[in-house]
């Protein structure tokens, strides 16, 4: 059984040494903390233009120590050290006590300072000065302890995955619930429809992994001829639909800071490398590192595993008016996946490659409503959140897109062990691939609630009619979905679309009419005739 890796643990505590200490106030008690990153009068976020480094993530430790967090992590098959929640509760209690203590010491410092100024004799002044020195040393001791506790809290807190939607099925991938099926009835499995075998035909060759090995190494492929044209058409088709529905088109960088990827909770799944309880949990290296002589200035860089990462970074440190949400973007980018643990037949063709083109959907919505109780801010238990509705919107958009391609596909509500670190709920879409004789994932859509927003500092103002507007500014919710993952859609289209003559020779390739206006290769796929239906 695969274990879900734990994300983004190691980098942040080291940043604490250079980060000015700010109050954690687990329930966001102080609005003055917002002045470090946000303007109270402008919707435009304040961003660092020098180094681009973000403040440390703001986690809600009161939520993280709740009893259901441990069972949620277990349900998601996240391998946390047993001491995680005990240590969190211990350190949070100690942080509260130490913070109260330092506040009391500072109040006493103020009184002693007045005593120094009001001293009538040199002896009285010297006595007051000695008290001031003792208090100063005690304050410094408390501050060092607070800094240590904050580092410990963040280290443990970052290991804990997002909450899970109440309707998420429990268990492994096999427990996924089929939500709906679409398109024509699946045709029988047929080995001669295997896209690898079809690619071996000279008249149809549409990809080449052999030259990919020469240029880049195993696991890279060239799309050629009809394969390249099909990628262009699929991208244009997906962008047309998304832009028509109001998504802002974006071309993102393919290189991102490792810190940003960590904050998004992104590492493609693979077999976890586990340490013992007294060591940091480790995960396999699934992202390609970028070596640069400017690394000291730019920080550690990686190739993006998905455009979701740079799209999320677009909103870092943003403060939005709720009336402007949801904000929707669609990006064309490349996804880079090292997939160190991948083995077997899927490494032969296009199903699993190290680099591919992807059209990604991304949304930012308002967060959950908050209420004030006993000077604390808690989230209302509302499963009909704006982000829940946005997830359904993304799912419906994906269904419309794939229905236009005329392939058999189904939507799955993915179980807890398939959610990764960041997803609150996730739908996968699988297409029938008769040459593989199996359903294959072509898309997903995830609601990450405030998991990424807390790490990237994405907030919004209170609605005007919100009675809790005196509380801290809420965190936004982020969502992402795949419009097109090119290689697997090519597999689905070709394996479902080829037509054979009675003798078994290729007759034609049926492609959906919606792609015709984006096709620049006439009515041929290589040397094979295209029939548009």
Segment roles from a protein language model:
Residues 97, 182-533:
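TRNA-recognition modules of translation machinery and tRNA-sensing kinases, especially anticodon-binding
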């Amino acid at each position: 059984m695969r274990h879900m890796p734990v994300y983004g643990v190691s980098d942040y505590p080291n940043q604490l040494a250079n980060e000015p200490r700010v109050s954690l106030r687990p329930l966001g008690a102080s609005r003055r903390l917002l002045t470090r990153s946000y303007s109270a009068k402008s919707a435009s976020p304040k961003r660092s233009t020098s180094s681009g480094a973000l403040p440390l993530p703001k986690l809600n430790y009161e939520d993280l120590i709740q009893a259901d967090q441990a069972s949620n992590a277990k349900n998601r098959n996240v391998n946390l050290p047993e001491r995680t929640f005990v240590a969190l509760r211990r350190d949070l209690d100690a942080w509260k006590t130490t913070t109260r203590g330092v506040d009391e010491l500072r109040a006493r410092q103020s009184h002693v300072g007045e005593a120094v100024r009001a001293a009538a004799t040199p002896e009285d002044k010297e006595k007051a000065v000695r008290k001031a020195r003792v208090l100063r040393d005690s304050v410094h001791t408390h501050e060092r302890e607070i800094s240590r506790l904050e580092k410990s809290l963040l280290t443990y807190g970052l290991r804990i995955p997002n909450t899970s939607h109440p309707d998420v099925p429990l268990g492994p991938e096999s427990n996924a619930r089929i939500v709906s099926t679409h398109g024509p009835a699946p045709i029988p499995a047929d080995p001669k429809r295997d896209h690898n075998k079809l690619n071996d035909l000279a008249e149809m060759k549409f990809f080449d992994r052999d030259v990919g090995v020469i240029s880049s190494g195993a696991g890279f492929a060239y799309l050629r001829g009809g394969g390249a044209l099909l990628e262009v058409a699929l991208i244009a088709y997906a962008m047309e639909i998304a832009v028509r529905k109001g998504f802002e088109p974006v071309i993102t960088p393919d290189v991102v800071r490792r810190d940003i990827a960590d904050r998004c909770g992104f590492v493609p799944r693979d077999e976890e490398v586990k340490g013992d309880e007294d060591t940091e949990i480790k995960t396999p290296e699934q992202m390609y590192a970028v070596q640069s002589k400017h690394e000291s200035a730019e920080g550690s860089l990686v190739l993006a595993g998905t455009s979701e990462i740079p799209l999320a970074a677009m909103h870092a440190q943003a403060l939005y008016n709720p009336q402007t949400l949801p904000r929707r973007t669609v990006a064309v980018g490349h996804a880079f996946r090292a997939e160190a643990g991948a083995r077997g037949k899927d490494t032969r063709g296009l199903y699993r490659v190290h680099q591919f083109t992807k059209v990604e959907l991304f949304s930012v919505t308002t967060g959950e409503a908050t209420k004030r109780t006993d000077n604390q801010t808690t989230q209302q238990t509302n499963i009909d959140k704006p982000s829940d509705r946005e997830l359904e919107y993304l799912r419906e958009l994906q269904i419309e897109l794939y229905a236009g391609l005329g392939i058999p596909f189904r939507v799955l509500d993915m179980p807890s062990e398939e959610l990764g670190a960041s997803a609150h709920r996730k739908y996968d879409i699988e297409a029938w691939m008769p040459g593989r004789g199996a359903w294959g994932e072509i898309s997903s859509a995830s609601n990450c609630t405030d998991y990424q927003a807390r790490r990237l500092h994405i907030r919004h103002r209170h609605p005007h009619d919100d009675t809790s507007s005196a509380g801290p500014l809420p965190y936004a919710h982020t969502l992402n979905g795949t419009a097109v993952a090119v290689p697997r859609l090519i597999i689905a289209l070709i394996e479902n679309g080829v037509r054979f003559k009675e003798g078994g020779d290729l007759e034609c390739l049926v492609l959906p009419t919606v792609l015709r206006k984006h096709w620049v290769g006439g009515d041929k796929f290589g040397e094979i005739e295209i029939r548009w239906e």
